[in-house]
Amino acid sequence: MKQTQSAAKPSDLPVYLFHQGNNFEAYRYFGSHLEEQDGQPGAVFRVWAPHAKAVSVVGDFNSWVPTSHPMEKVSDGIWELFIPGIKIYDVYKYCITTPADELVYKADPYAFHAETRPSNGSKVFDISSFDWHDAAWEDAQKKNDVINGPMSIYELHAGSWKMKEDGVPYNYSELADQLVPYIKDMGYTHVELLPITEYPFDGSWGYQVSGYFAPTSRYGTPHDFMEFVDKLHAAGIGVILDWVPAHFPKDAYGLYMFDGGPCYEDPNPRRGEHKEWGTMVFNFGMPEVESFLVSSALFWIEQYHVDGLRVDAVASMLYLDYNRRDGEWEQNVKGGKENLEAIAFLQKCNTAILGRHPHKMMIAEESTAWPLVTKPAADGGLGFNFKWNMGWMNDMLSYMKTDPLFRAGNHNKVTFSFFYAFSENFVLPISHDEVVHGKCSLINKMPGDYEAKFANLRTFYGYMMAHPGKKLLFMGQEFGQFIEWDEKKQLDWMLLGYDKHHELQTYVKDLNHFYRETASLWQVDYSWEGFQWIVPDDNKQSVIAFLRRDAKGKMLLVVCNFNPVLRESYSMGVPNPGTYKELINSDDVKYGGTGVKNGSVKSVKGPMHGFDQHIEVTLPPLSTIYFSVPAARKKAGKPAKAETAEAAKPEKAAKPAATKTAAPKKRTAKPVATKPAAKKPRAAKTTKPKTPVTES
């Protein structure tokens, strides 16, 4: 193939901005781009390799001969070449001559497409030719209040959610066809995909990225992934991607020692490597690396229309001593352990994205108490608009794993989150990290026998949905997947043939739909205006009760019994006189419960918990119940008590009548462990098996 070098000089502005760390669309300049020069169609290639002695483009088109297509150094560290005749899907790499005169073959850091592992070459691709149909979705999102709207996220791994009969994963477009009806039926607002940026090792789940501008070819082409997003948006479902700017792998064809020396990684060995992960840390203080990473983040939002990025491993970026022993790290210039360059990068990245697209989401997976994560960079914050609440997750899973006999002594784990619940814009995450590496699935974390496990999990889900903050649940946990997640296998969908699993799925579906329809559960998530304790301190009986409010003051009463004991005539103060109607009860028979219900309960005049009124309810064992709250009755010259958003000082929970086991004839008398009569399967005449073989 005849070689034609580009005579055109690089545009001054993108190059200048790139070297300043401010080219946030560097992918438009670097990489491979189909174009025509001097009447000849082909592609222009550009790469940043500041230490290289020479660079050439190699591929099938020149039999991978390094001397066939040498590139021209056109600027400080930037190499360029136009090659006529190049077409879409052509495979290529850069052959780089290092300062030590060694040849290294590297994939294009800015490639839009790549070969499927174990092959690792880059592919030429034109992403601009896709015909989008989601303008209505995009316009609607610009008008939505992302902070004060409902958000229930379904986290999934694209390759193992569901597979074809032959065990092959669906491609992106096929996956969308399977996923859309399920997500709509289940009531989720968003899906969050584990990383789909190209990666070499299946076992990393995508968290060791080799291609920051290429959706993994495991599941199809870039256009296939665009179609995935387009189909979900058409169905009213948002798409969030996991994005990994914290570190990258050492694979020889990737970013590691890209041109024979530290290029993308920090050159200081005490800052530039995560030894426990076997990965390299980006040099966040290098302007060209800043341009690369911010461009990647904006690329997925602007070119693939995704609705947000969940930024992985933020804590590892913030602290120089993260997972490092004494002597393995160095202080910053101020004598502290904070990574000042990483902080500045995160602030720049978030400001760039949310400045352009304020309706999008930047979500931090940050596991420490770092302050102001979701406050603007201009105010000293990191600039995210959401943060995973890892403290809540750890406390609640620890509490739920505890035998109910010992929960009284751990009651603070249920209530402690409210000391900081409104300090950040939190997402409550029950993610993939909690159901792998011997941690057990969520259902298997629950104590007790088969029935009790499901009752515990329903109680937890009801509490989680009512707790302030947006929601996230990993795939399979909505129907009680018993075994841990394995990225090589699809979920155990056959479990839905068993009553308890189908009933749990029905409960999660009803919770999601109720949540979306009930503004008090999401409209004021990040202020005491939207929450008020009624019973925070009944640790002896493991009961809590609280109110949620929407922006207009409409309330929902939530009561949780974390003990497997029936509580009859349980009294609690309520804000308004009138009838309190039971709306959702996790112990409902249709959810697999024992059927203890309240129906409607009328308030009784008499002070309790700072209110003038109180009610008496029956609390099923291991249950969460939602009650409607009647509107306040206006009294001339005398405002109703307890209508302020400030939480009234709670009194000790009133002792209910002596706990007792109900008479056998009453439906409410069934203990938790008692199995209800077998039900007929939904679409079959034979009775569903009651108990599948489970992993202990």
Task: List PLM regions with ranges.
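Conserved, mostly hydrophobic/aromatic
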Residues: 47, 94, 156, 183, ...
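Short proline/glycine-enriched turn/loop motifs at strand-loop junctions of beta-rich domains
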Residues: 48-55, 575-578
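C-terminal beta-strand-rich structural cap/linker in extracellular carbohydrate-active enzymes
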Residues: 88-92, 599-635
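Conserved alpha/beta catalytic core and glycan-binding cleft of carbohydrate-active enzymes
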Residues: 305-307, 322-488, 495, 516-587, ...
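Intrinsically disordered, polybasic Lys/Arg-rich low-complexity tracts
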Residues: 633-696
